[in-house]
């Protein structure tokens, strides 16, 4: 056998051996500097025990995509390949719903009806501008259930390129969240507190609807605490989380004790508090003014014991959302967006899962939150920009502020905390205090 034939046979045998070994020892490598193709442990945990297929239809397909959205398609494909590499039951297809002209309009109507809102894009090509419609959505189906997965994460004021970059960072969460909805049945329960003149259902309907995709939701009133405090506490302990959305009526000591003991027994709570009574609608009168006053909810000692103080002051800032007002007389009036210092836009520098990749959040007549030194861990979730000032109450608020030139030097109070997470071992508000009634097995922490 000549040397050339030996070399060829050796090469063939080596290739067969490599192919056999690679088939047995399959491994994907992420060589990107930011490891964006490496799934997080939490994302892997969602699908690791999946035993039947999740089929994903992605509608991000087309011929006339801008380059930014071709990148989004590529990143989506590579991410789903990573999911599929972790569990072969992740199956995906790219579909162009607009490819066939004869079914184009019907497909648009059907997808829109299912909640997949189309997106209109500007396309620049050869110096010419045109418009394109895309559906940046995916539908994931599992065991006769289907969820919508948005591929675009909107961001206020972002260009198309910035929008896509922001969306790429959000892709893993979007798919992991969608898969979790399909795989994990609802287990936890949330109580929406009623009875202290909280927001009416119509004002929190969208919020509650979104929560309902993950949790069981039910209203809960503390009215029975006067006659049946022990039963009220037992009933509320059945919930994993309570939400009090903008209460406007003070809490009684009896109600506070039940809420305090709920916390002592491991219950979680979300408090959406306005410490100042002021509504934008109240300014739409002949004078364009109204008075902002302190709203006493009888919760000062409650929050103080847990490590925060919500001050009855309004935050005024140069970095805020505008107010829309009709300017001019009669038929000549026009709606204009005007600078309005009482609607701060709050963001976060934290990478905490609650606020990671969260857009700016608009507040109205927001109040300053101080944190106090104790053993409770405090995470600042939302903060204003640094150009702020604090306005005490009572005080008159007027729409005329939109016509006044603001002095930036007076906005010198720095970043203000508008949302904070408290974690740790809490001590009872009623520890070493006379309680409004006796409770069996009351806890001090």
Predicted segments with their positions:
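Juxtamembrane extramembrane loops of integral membrane proteins
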Residues: 4-249, 256, 274
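Acidic, S/T/G-rich, low-cysteine, solvent-exposed domains in lumenal/extracellular/periplasmic regions
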Residues: 173, 184, 200-445
């Amino acid at each position: 056998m000549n040397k050339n034939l030996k070399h060829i046979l050796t090469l063939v045998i080596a290739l067969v051996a490599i192919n056999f070994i690679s088939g047995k020892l399959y491994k994907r490598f992420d060589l990107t500097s930011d490891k964006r193709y490496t799934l997080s442990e939490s994302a892997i945990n969602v699908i690791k025990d999946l035993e039947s297929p999740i089929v994903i239809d992605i509608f991000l397909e087309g011929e006339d995509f801008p380059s930014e959205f071709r990148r989004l398609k590529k990143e989506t494909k590579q991410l789903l390949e990573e999911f599929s590499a972790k569990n072969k039951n992740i199956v995906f297809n790219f579909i162009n719903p607009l490819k066939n002209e004869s079914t184009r309009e019907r497909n648009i109507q059907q997808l829109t009806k299912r909640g997949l809102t189309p997106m209109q894009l500007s396309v620049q090509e050869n110096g010419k501008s045109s418009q394109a419609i895309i559906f940046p959505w995916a539908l994931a189906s599992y065991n006769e259930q289907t969820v919508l997965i948005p591929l675009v994460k909107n961001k206020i004021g972002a260009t198309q390129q910035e929008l896509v970059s922001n969306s790429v960072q959000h892709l893993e969460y979007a798919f992991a969240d969608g898969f979790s909805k399909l795989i994990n049945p609802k287990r936890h329960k949330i109580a929406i507190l009623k009875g202290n003149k909280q927001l009416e259902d119509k004002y929190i309907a969208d919020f509650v609807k979104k929560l309902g995709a993950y949790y069981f939701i039910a209203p809960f009133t503390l009215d029975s605490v006067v006659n049946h405090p022990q039963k009220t506490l037992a009933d509320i302990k059945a919930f994993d989380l309570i939400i009090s959305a903008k209460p406007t009526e003070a809490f009684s000591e009896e109600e506070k004790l039940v809420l305090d003991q709920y916390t002592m027994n491991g219950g979680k709570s979300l408090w959406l508090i306005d410490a100042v009574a002021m509504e934008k609608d109240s300014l739409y009168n002949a004078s364009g003014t109204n008075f902002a006053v302190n709203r006493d909810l009888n919760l000062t000692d409650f929050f103080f014991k847990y490590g925060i103080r919500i001050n009855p002051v309004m935050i005024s800032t140069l970095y805020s959302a505008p107010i829309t007002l009709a300017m001019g007389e009669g038929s000549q009036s026009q709606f204009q967006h005007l600078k309005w210092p009482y609607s701060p836009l709050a963001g976060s520098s934290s990478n905490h899962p609650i606020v990671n990749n969260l857009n700016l959040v608009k507040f109205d007549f927001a109040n300053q939150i101080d944190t106090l030194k104790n053993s409770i861990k405090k995470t600042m979730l939302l903060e204003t920009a640094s150009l702020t000032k604090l306005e005490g109450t009572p005080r008159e608020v007027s729409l005329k502020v939109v016509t006044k030139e603001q002095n930036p030097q007076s906005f010198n109070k720095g970043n203000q905390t508008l949302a904070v997470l408290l974690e740790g071992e809490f001590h009872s508000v009623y520890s070493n205090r006379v309680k409004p009634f006796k409770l069996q097995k009351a806890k001090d922490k």
